[in-house]
Amino acid sequence: VVEGQYNKLEIEKINEVDAIVVLGGSLRINELKNKYNIEWGDADRFFGGLKLYKEKKSKKIIFTGGKMPYNLTKLSEGDVLKKYAIEYGINADDILVTKDALNTFEESEAVQELLGENKNIILVTSAFHMKRAKKLFEQKGFNVTAYKVDYKTAPIVKINFINLIPSANSLSKTEIAFREILGRFYYNLLFQD
């Protein structure tokens, strides 16, 4: 229900755009005795953006500078992703990082400040997050090609007893879906016409 809005695109069918925009939420930064420990969560966002760049879908890649309240460090997520992208061979001059953003709405504003309006972008985020993210970026005047990654669900081909046993993983996926539905509801109320 949450992930099904947009099908995954084949890269060769995607046109070149002004920028590839990789949304935050793919890692957690922990600081211990002035050393940083990076924990990957939804790394598919990062690697999906790199793949699009290497396939020459844009000359620019933007990492949003997510700085979540639980990351009590000086580094933003965008800064860390830029560092890793350079290590993976992306030209530093082709990488932009937005100012700090706490949520998807702030990410859309920060990208708009960098690019302006009426730009064509490929938006890279988790499948469950795409519907809300795409809507917010379109409201900022972007022409969005949705590139979904990090699918949390897969179709059940055959139902058997194992599928019916509750699991912590299923509970976690339910929590993600519930949070996303609440986020959609909130933004629908906020931006009613």
Indicate where each model-derived feature is located.
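A structural signal for short, hydrophobic/glycine-enriched beta-strand patches
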Residues: 1-174
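A transmembrane-helix-recognition feature enriched in membrane-embedded lipid enzymes
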Residues: 174-193
